Amino acid sequence: MKTYAWILLTIFIFGCNQNTQSQNNKKHYVDLKTVADLQDYLAYKKGQKAIVSAHRGGPMPGYPENAIETFENALTYAPCIIELDVNKTADGKLILMHDDTLDRTTTGSGKVSEATWEQLQKLHLKDAEGTVTSFKIPTFEEVLNWGKTRAVMCIDIKKGIDPQEIVDMIHKTQAQKHSIIIVYNRPMLVKYHKIDPSLCISASASTVESVKETLALGVPSKNLIMFVGISEPQPEVYELLHQNGIKAILGTMHNLDNSALKKGEQVYQKLISNGADVLATDNVKLSASAISKMK
């Protein structure tokens, strides 16, 4: 009888441990079915919870930037928008890489544009401290397919890459429903919209005047989310965006993230109370925790 009781206790403890582990490893996936779903997800709605945007995918110790494994880790903290960087190899392969050179984030060296995809496949990614990981450089196509049932992706395209190439890959992978294109000027905004009027685009505007000028280009508000800079804009900027149903992304990387590290989660909570809808952050864990505690 004692033996039987011990077996039951062991099974119970094992089951509890497994349950705790699965809770700790829970993934906050966002599975959108249509472009209309993405437009609705990005639309400003009063009282809606703020969203974390994981800058460069949310790197942490052991998790290098622009790696699928890092994206998966970020999603254990919150249903993050995954911000990523697209670069291009010497032989025309679209890959994920922020820098123009390989030295900082990989075991390789030299320019990305001078390396072939075959050469890059032999490299490993390094985290921010320079620790070599087992993770490999992913292709843009691989990441678009990965994100289909997992996350909205905000795509930062390096200079020199033809917008048509980016859109063609999005179409090939049927990724319109979970892809946002980042642009840094109005001509590029218009260009992407002309290539595919259904695309959702992250434009930049940090003043009331620049918001008005962007809206005057004719891109529907439902296709837009607006990056307002790495410091807080005037309240009128948030008001104008929200009046047009557009969410505002505030970049907290650098100064605002550093302030939150020193002063605590209330820094993020204050930014959200002031009008920010999305926090583009290098500190996924802290910002996600701050948002989770807000009503």
Language model region names:
Residues C16-K295:
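Phosphate-group recognition and catalysis centered on beta-loop-alpha active-site segments
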Residues Y4-I13:
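Sec-dependent N-terminal signal peptides
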